[in-house]
Regions:
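Conserved acetyl-CoA-binding loop-helix of GNAT-fold acetyltransferases
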Residues: 77-96, 118-122
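Conserved acetyl-CoA-binding loop of GNAT-fold acetyltransferases
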Residues: 121-130
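Conserved beta-hairpin
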Residues: 36-54
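Conserved beta-strand-loop-alpha-helix junction that forms the acyl-donor binding cleft
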Residues: 77, 106-117, 133-139
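Conserved GNAT acetyl-CoA-binding A-motif
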Residues: 95-109
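Short amphipathic alpha-helix that is part of the acyltransferase structural core
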Residues: 1-26
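Conserved N-terminal entry element of GNAT/NAT acetyltransferase domains
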Residues: 1-7, 149-168
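Conserved acyl-donor/pantetheine-binding loop and adjacent beta-alpha core of acyl/acetyltransferases
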Residues: 48-71, 134-138
C-alpha cells in the first residue's frame, strides 16, 4: 500500500471521471488536496480517500464521529480481482498503527449501492446508522469498523513508502 503522489493525480482523476455515475460529486481540487495531504492511497488500481477528523462531526442521523476517528470518503477500484479487499484491509491495519487515530473508521454509502455495501460487509464493516443528502432525496447508510490499536508495530516496516517525518 502506498500514498498517492502528485504524479498520480491525472491517472486517479481519470478513474473518477470514468465513474461519474458512482462519484458525481468528486471535484479535482478536492482530489489534489487529498493527495497533497497524504489522505489518498493509490495501489494496484485501488484509490482510497480518507480523513482523520480533527473535531466531532455528524456523519449519520444519530452517529457523530469523534476527534481522531477516521472517515473513509471514497473507495474506487478498476478491477474485480480481490485487490480492493486486500488494500482496504491494509488500510485498516495502517489506521490501527497511527498514534493519533482512534481506530474507529466510518464510511457513508448510498443505500441503493448494494454491491458496495456487500463489499464493506465482507470486509468486516457493520451498518450502524442512516443518513440522507440533497434535502432527503438521496438515502444513505453509515458503516463502521473498529480496528484494534496495534502500537507495537513500526509504521515504516509495515508500509515501506511511509514517511513518518510527515506526521511528527
Amino acid at each position: 500500500m502506498k500514498f498517492a503522489v502528485e504524479d498520480d493525480f491525472l491517472e486517479i482523476s481519470e478513474l473518477f471521471k470514468n465513474n461519474r455515475k458512482l462519484f458525481p460529486h468528486i471535484r479535482m481540487g478536492y482530489l489534489l488536496r487529498s493527495i497533497q495531504q497524504n489522505e489518498c492511497i493509490y495501489t494496484d488500481g485501488v484509490v482510497i480517500i480518507f480523513k482523520i477528523h480533527q473535531r466531532t462531526t455528524q456523519i449519520g442521523n444519530i452517529t457523530k464521529s469523534q476527534k481522531s476517528d477516521c472517515h473513509l470518503n471514497q473507495i474506487l477500484t478498476t478491477k474485480n480481482d480481490g485487490s480492493a479487499s486486500k488494500i482496504l484491509n491494509q488500510f485498516f491495519n495502517y489506521i490501527s498503527l497511527l498514534p493519533h487515530a482512534s481506530g474507529v473508521i466510518y464510511l457513508n454509502v448510498r443505500s441503493e449501492n448494494d454491491s458496495a455495501k456487500k463489499f464493506y460487509e465482507r470486509n468486516g464493516m457493520k451498518l450502524i446508522d442512516k443518513i440522507s443528502w440533497s434535502d432527503g432525496k438521496i438515502e444513505g447508510d453509515v458503516y463502521q469498523i473498529i480496528v484494534k490499536k496495534n502500537g507495537n508495530q513500526n509504521l515504516e516496516s509495515f508500509f515501506p513508502s511511509f514517511d513518518a517525518s510527515k506526521y511528527v
